C-alpha cells in the first residue's frame, strides 16, 4: 500500500483571521512542508482557504444548517463538532496549527484533543496566558500566546506567527522520525506527592518488564492516562492514586470528570487500583478555600495548595461512587485496600490520620463493589507507602496481566 503523504492542517476563521492564516501558509510552504488551509468561520462567507467553511460544516451530524445559525455561541459549538468530524476523516493529518481568539480557540482545540497523542498540535491564541485546561484537556496541545490580538499583521504578530510556523514545521518533521522502542509494553500509573514512595517502589519493580508512564493525579493527569487506555496504548493500569474523585465530588480544584474509570471499562485493560490520597480535597492558596470549608481540617501543603481532610460521610459517598464505576468494568480488576492509611498525611501522628474516616471508605467499597472472579477487592494490612503494599500491587498486576 502506498504511503499517504502527511500534511500540516492550518485552521482559522478566515473571515477575521484570513490575513494571518495566509501569512502562515506562505511561511510553511517556504519551509518546504505541505499545508492544507481550513476555514472554520461560522459566518458562511467565502474565503481562499483550500477547505471551505461550508465543506467543514457539512460534516456536522445534522448538516451545515446546524452550524450557520446566526447565533455565535451555538454556531461555535456546532462548528467545533463539525471540524472534529472533518479532521477525523482525513488520513493525511501530520500536524495541526490553529490561530484564534477565545472563540477560535474553543472552536479548533476540540478537534486537536481528539487526535492521538504524538500528532503535533499547536494553538496560537490570545487565551494562552491564562487557564488553558479547558482547551488542552488530557491531550498534548502546545499553546502559544499571541501577545497582541490576532487581528491583523504587525511587527509583533509577524514574529510570533513566524515562530509558530517554525515550531509546527519542526515538530511535523520530528514526528515522522522513528523513536527508539525497546519493546517493553507501557503501563499507566497514577501518583500524587503523598503517594510518591508507593509509586517509586512499584516502578522500580516493574521497570525491567514495562515502560512505566507515571501521571500526576491533577484531574487532567488521570484523563491523560485514560485517553491512552481508550487508544489501546496501555498494556495495563496501576491506578494507585484516585484522589481526583475527592475533588470531583466535593468541589476541589484537581477534579476528574464523571467519566473517571470509563476508559477502564471500555478498554478492558488489566487494572489494579487503590485509594491513594482519597483523604484529601485540593484547593488553592488558603484564602481561596470556600467559606463553607474554612472550619474544616485544613493543611497548607505549600503556599499555593491547601488540602482539606475528607470526613467519614464523604468517604462513604466516594467509596460508593468508585464502586459503581468499578462494577461497569468487565476486564480483570483488582482494587487494593491499604488498611494502614491512604496517604503520607494519613498515618499515625500525621495531620489527616483518621481511622474512622478510612473505615467508612473501605466499608462503602465492600458494600457496593460486586465482586466476581475478575473483579476483586484485596485487603492489604499496611500503609499505602509501605513497600509491602507496593509489592502486593505488583503481584496483583502480574497475576492479571499474564
Curated annotation (Swiss-Prot):
InterPro entries (UniProt xref): Tobamovirus_resist_UPF0261, UPF0261, UPF0261_C, UPF0261_N
Cited PANTHER family: UPF0261 DOMAIN PROTEIN (AFU_ORTHOLOGUE AFUA_1G10120)
Family affiliation: Belongs to the UPF0261 family.
HAMAP family assigned to the protein according to its UniProt record, in alphabetical order: UPF0261 (MF_00677)
The protein's name in its UniProt record: UPF0261 protein BP1203
Species the sequence originates in: Bordetella pertussis (strain Tohama I / ATCC BAA-589 / NCTC 13251)
Amino acid at each position: 500500500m502506498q504511503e499517504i503523504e502527511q500534511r500540516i492542517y492550518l485552521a482559522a476563521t478566515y473571515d477575521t483571521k484570513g490575513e494571518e492564516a495566509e501569512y502562515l501558509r506562505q511561511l510553511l510552504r517556504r519551509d518546504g512542508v505541505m499545508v492544507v488551509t481550513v476555514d472554520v468561520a461560522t459566518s458562511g462567507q467565502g474565503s481562499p482557504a483550500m477547505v471551505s467553511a461550508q465543506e467543514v460544516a457539512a460534516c456536522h451530524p445534522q448538516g451545515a444548517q446546524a452550524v450557520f445559525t446566526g447565533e455565535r455561541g451555538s454556531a461555535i459549538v456546532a462548528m467545533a463538532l463539525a471540524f472534529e468530524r472533518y479532521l477525523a476523516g482525513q488520513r493525511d493529518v501530520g500536524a495541526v496549527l490553529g490561530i484564534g481568539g477565545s472563540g477560535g480557540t474553543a472552536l479548533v482545540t476540540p478537534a486537536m484533543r481528539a487526535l492521538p497523542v504524538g500528532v503535533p498540535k499547536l494553538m496560537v491564541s490570545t487565551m494562552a496566558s491564562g487557564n488553558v485546561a479547558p482547551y488542552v484537556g488530557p491531550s498534548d496541545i502546545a499553546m502559544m500566546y499571541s501577545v497582541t490580538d490576532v487581528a491583523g499583521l504587525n511587527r509583533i504578530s509577524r514574529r510570533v506567527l513566524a515562530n509558530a510556523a517554525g515550531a509546527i514545521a519542526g515538530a511535523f518533521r520530528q514526528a515522522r522520525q522513528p523513536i527508539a522502542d525497546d519493546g517493553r509494553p507501557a503501563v499507566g500509573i497514577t501518583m500524587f506527592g503523598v503517594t510518591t514512595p508507593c509509586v517509586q517502589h512499584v516502578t522500580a519493580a516493574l521497570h525491567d518488564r514495562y515502560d512505566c508512564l507515571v501521571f500526576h493525579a491533577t484531574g487532567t493527569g488521570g484523563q491523560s492516562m485514560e485517553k491512552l487506555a481508550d487508544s489501546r496504548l496501555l498494556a495495563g493500569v496501576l491506578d494507585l492514586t484516585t484522589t481526583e474523585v475527592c475533588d470531583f465530588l466535593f468541589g476541589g480544584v484537581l477534579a476528574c470528570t464523571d467519566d473517571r474509570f470509563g476508559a477502564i471499562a471500555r478498554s478492558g485493560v488489566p487494572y489494579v487500583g487503590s485509594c491513594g490520597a482519597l483523604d484529601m480535597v485540593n484547593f488553592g492558596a488558603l484564602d481561596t478555600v470556600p467559606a463553607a470549608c474554612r472550619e474544616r481540617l485544613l493543611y497548607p501543603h505549600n503556599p499555593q495548595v491547601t488540602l482539606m481532610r475528607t470526613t467519614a460521610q464523604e468517604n462513604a459517598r466516594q467509596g460508593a461512587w468508585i464502586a459503581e464505576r468499578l462494577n461497569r468494568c468487565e476486564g480483570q480488576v483488582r482494587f487494593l485496600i491499604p488498611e494502614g492509611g491512604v496517604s503520607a498525611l494519613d498515618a499515625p501522628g500525621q495531620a489527616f490520620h483518621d481511622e474512622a474516616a478510612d473505615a467508612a471508605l473501605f466499608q462503602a467499597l465492600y458494600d457496593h463493589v460486586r465482586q466476581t472472579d475478575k473483579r476483586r477487592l484485596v485487603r492489604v494490612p499496611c500503609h499505602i507507602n509501605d513497600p509491602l503494599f507496593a509489592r502486593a500491587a505488583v503481584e496483583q498486576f502480574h497475576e492479571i496481566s499474564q
